[in-house]
């Protein structure tokens, strides 16, 4: 009888353990966890399968964040950092074809008219939904000219040396609490490189949407315009109104070489509950 109960007890523990693993994985998948810990930072790096140097950069940024005070410039902010979700996995796979975007996500952007006039007015368009970019596309003519217009995560994987040349060079992670926060949990954003003496006739555009309550969005945008080149980049940001706060803390680094021209336009239409 004791052997039976021992076996039954072990079986129950196994079932409970298996259930907890499923719950844990689903929590990360849905992104419902709140609060920032080193485990959260490392989990983001794991999900993105990043190189070691980026993982260590995130950890340094996290340490600076938890040991620093809010900046002494601007209005006093009453942010509850424990009530923010710092990362949410993509709800639609990254694609360069709008028809392949998840219908739920597509409906949100279609209502805003983000993609409707892409071919008519823009040389390239990107769209980010919460933590991840879900759509990125550029006309083939610019690809032939070696222009790079990618989401930042893809640029890190595809052009690691070019990425490292510009990343964290203008805006250091230890400038203030919010640059450190971005360094720890950055996700998504736009990476643009325009080679020498290349002129883009129409703008590139990216659109950033916070669509979940208590969500933090931390995109990282890098724009490098080489000698004698010209580009106009337009960035749009918005979020619906919820009864709880959200947080947007992005970093933008722009490099403009000799005789180059760069026009950067940002249109931010945040709801009143977004810090």
Regions found by a protein language model. Name each.
Residues 3, 9-10, 18-26:
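Short, positively charged and aromatic/hydrophobic N-terminal segments
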């Amino acid at each position: 009888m004791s052997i039976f109960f021992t076996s039954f007890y072990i079986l129950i523990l196994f079932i409970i353990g298996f259930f907890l693993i499923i719950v844990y994985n689903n929590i990360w998948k849905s992104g419902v966890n709140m609060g920032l810990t080193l485990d959260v930072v490392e989990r983001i790096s794991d999900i993105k399968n990043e190189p070691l140097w980026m993982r260590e950069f995130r950890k340094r940024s996290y340490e600076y964040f938890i040991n620093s005070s809010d900046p002494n410039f601007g209005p006093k902010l009453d942010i509850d950092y424990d009530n923010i979700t710092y990362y949410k996995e993509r709800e639609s796979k990254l694609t360069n074809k709008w028809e392949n975007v998840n219908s739920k996500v597509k409906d949100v952007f279609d209502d805003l008219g983000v993609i409707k006039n892409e071919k008519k007015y823009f040389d390239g368009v990107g769209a980010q939904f919460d933590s991840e970019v879900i759509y990125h596309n550029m006309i083939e003519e610019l690809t032939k000219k070696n222009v790079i217009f990618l989401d930042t995560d893809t640029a890190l994987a595809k052009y690691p040396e070019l990425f490292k040349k510009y990343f964290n060079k203008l805006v250091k992670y230890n400038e203030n609490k919010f640059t450190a926060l971005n360094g720890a949990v950055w996700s998504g954003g736009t990476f643009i490189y325009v080679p020498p003496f290349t002129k883009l006739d129409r703008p590139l555009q990216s659109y950033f949407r916070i669509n979940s309550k208590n969500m933090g969005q931390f995109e990282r945008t890098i724009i490098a315009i080489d000698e004698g080149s010209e580009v106009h980049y337009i960035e749009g940001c918005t979020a619906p109104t919820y009864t709880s706060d959200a947080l947007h803390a992005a970093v933008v680094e722009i490099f403009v070489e000799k005789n180059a021209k760069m026009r950067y336009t940002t249109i931010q239409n945040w709801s009143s509950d977004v810090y």
